[in-house]
Amino acid sequence: AYVHASMFSVMALFALGDGGYAWEELEKSMVISHQMTTKSPFVFSNSYCENQDEGIFGFSAIDWFTGSGTVFIKNILRAGFGIEPDLLGLNLKTCAVMPCKKAHISLTVKGKRICVEYKNSGVGKRRIQIDGRDLRTSYDSIRRTECAHISTADLHDNMRIQILD
C-alpha cells in the first residue's frame, strides 16, 4: 500500500467518526519510524508514455516521491485537531478520540496567529474555550464530537483555543 493513498482512507475514517482506527492507521503510515512496514512513501506515476528515440512504450519506469508527508500533516491538522478554515471563519471539529493526553499547535489562520491546545483531564464532556471563555458547541453525530465555529471577525492574534475533555 502507498502512504499517499492510505492518507485518503485515514481522512475518511476521521470523517466517519472512527478516530481510534484512523490514529492507528496514521501511525502505521509513518514508514520512517518502523523497521518493517507495509506501506511505501512512493506511488506509481501512471505516466505511461511513448518515446521512440528512447525505446519507451507503455510503461512507467520508476516510482516517484509524492506529497505523502503533506497529506499526513493535513490529516493531523484538519482531521485530528479538527482545524478547518472556511470562507466564513474557522470550524473546530477535533477528533473525539485523541491518542494523547495533551497536544498543542500554533499556526496562522486567516492572517491571525492562533494556538490550539487539547487536554484530556478525564472530565468526559468536551468543552471548547476561546481565551478561557466557553464557546457554544453543537454535536456532530457523524464525527461523534462536539464542534464549534469562530467567525473571521472574531479571530484575533494570539487567540488561545482550548479543547478540553
Regions found by a protein language model. Give the residues of each.
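Non-catalytic C-terminal accessory modules of carbohydrate-active enzymes
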Residues: 8-165
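Generic helix N-cap/helix-start motif at coil->alpha-helix transitions
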Residues: 1-3
